[in-house]
Amino acid sequence: MKISLSPPPFADAPVVVLIAGLGGSGSYWLPQLAALEQEYQVVCYDQRGTGNNAGELPHGYTLGNMADELYQALLNAGIPRFTVIGHALGALVGLQLAIAHPDAVRALVCVNGWLSLNAHTRRCFQIRERLLHAGGAQAWVEAQPLFLYPADWMAARAPRMEAEEALALAHFQGTNNLQRRLLALKQADFRAQAKHVHCPVQIICSTDDLLVPSVCSTELHAALPGSHKTVMRQGGHACNVTDPDTFNALLLNGLASLMHNPEPVFKESQ
């Protein structure tokens, strides 16, 4: 699997690995790259079955497969230890990596993630799947921004929304791959496994996330006693895209705390 590595800003710079959500594209993290690359060597990648790692995914594809193929790609690149920053599905992959490879994962940042699929999120995906079956890729792509962005933010950026729609349609991962990746997402359940996450964890969520209610991050925070939860008042599911200045400040401060504070952080900030 192909991955992209930025030049290290200094010798022995720590490595952060960015994992996108269901869309799978490494470009999702573009608003964070410039800030992160000043302090870290950054790994971005398109997930298996998407972008420049396209190809038909097998039946029974799992979250474990997603974590294992990324871990192997990192080892092949000479990266045995790293910090994970994951959004939604990417946060789940990060949890899986932290459990399966505890010596490799230095710290973990979960953005709008969850322990197990919330009933509201399941309902959203059921609606989106019906759109996919009824209207194909066009309907899926047209509906996607409604679950990602706040209404006012979208309304002020109509040309951008049209451009994003055209780009997403041109690079659509394919119905089979999408459904297999979505099934892996829906089947993931960390309620019994969270106790095996021993690395420092930062949790970031947005109160106006339409797709993943912020209560999911509250539950994740409760299951990871040493975690630090930060709540953004607005930004939607893709809060790192809609309010990158706020998000980047929270992320950089959180990373510094995770990597340099040897004691677990129990404070919840809002």
From Swiss-Prot:
InterPro entries: AB_hydrolase_1, AB_hydrolase_fold, AB_hydrolase_sf, Pyrimidine_utilisation_RutD
A single GO molecular function term of this UniProt record: hydrolase activity, acting on carbon-nitrogen (but not peptide) bonds, in linear amides
This protein's record includes keyword Nucleus: no
Reactions catalysed, as given in the entry: carbamate + 2 H(+) = NH4(+) + CO2
SUPFAM superfamilies referenced in this protein's UniProt entry, alphabetically: alpha/beta-Hydrolases
Secretion signal span: none
Pfam families listed in its UniProt record: Abhydrolase_1
Reported function: Involved in pyrimidine catabolism. May facilitate the hydrolysis of carbamate, a reaction that can also occur spontaneously.
Protein name as it appears in the record: Putative carbamate hydrolase RutD
Organism listed in the record: Enterobacter sp. (strain 638)
